[in-house]
């Protein structure tokens, strides 16, 4: 199973890239974890946000292909680390690749939300999208470590 984080936005601050890559490199070869960045639509005073969201959503879903779509969204289900570890095992047993979608400044398109088989909430707070990349990478690595009895996670 491959996990792909599909996120709107490019040119992240160096701390985001460093943090994400630190956890990305720790994933085992049998569970590759990759990042696909979708360029954000041009936003300005007269921007058509609905159209921008639609374009970003189409690009995200195209990048996912036939993978299981999981959105990262405030109304999603909050998981504890042990619950996320269970989800990781369920995703592996499903046999499909998993695509985790992080929207842009206005969130995810209605098409992305409709395509989602699951929705995961990291917090009831609105988090900066760059920070979400790092939090997701660390959370997934921690969940993996729990499933393999790796000493990274401690209760």
From Swiss-Prot:
Where does this one sit in the cell?
Cytoplasm
Q: Which GO terms describe its cellular component?
A: cytoplasm
- Documented EC number(s): 2.1.1.177
* Entry-linked SUPFAM superfamilies: alpha/beta knot (SSF75217)
Record carries keyword Signal: no
Residues bound to S-adenosyl-L-methionine: 72, 103, 122-127
List the catalytic activities from the record.
pseudouridine(1915) in 23S rRNA + S-adenosyl-L-methionine = N(3)-methylpseudouridine(1915) in 23S rRNA + S-adenosyl-L-homocysteine + H(+)
What keywords is this UniProt entry annotated with? Cytoplasm, Methyltransferase, rRNA processing, S-adenosyl-L-methionine, Transferase
Q: Which GO terms describe its molecular function?
A: rRNA (pseudouridine-N3-)-methyltransferase activity
Uppermost EC category:
transferase
User: Subunit info?
Assistant: Homodimer.
Cited function: Specifically methylates the pseudouridine at position 1915 (m3Psi1915) in 23S rRNA.
Q: What is this protein called?
A: Ribosomal RNA large subunit methyltransferase H
Which gene holds the coding sequence for this protein?
rlmH
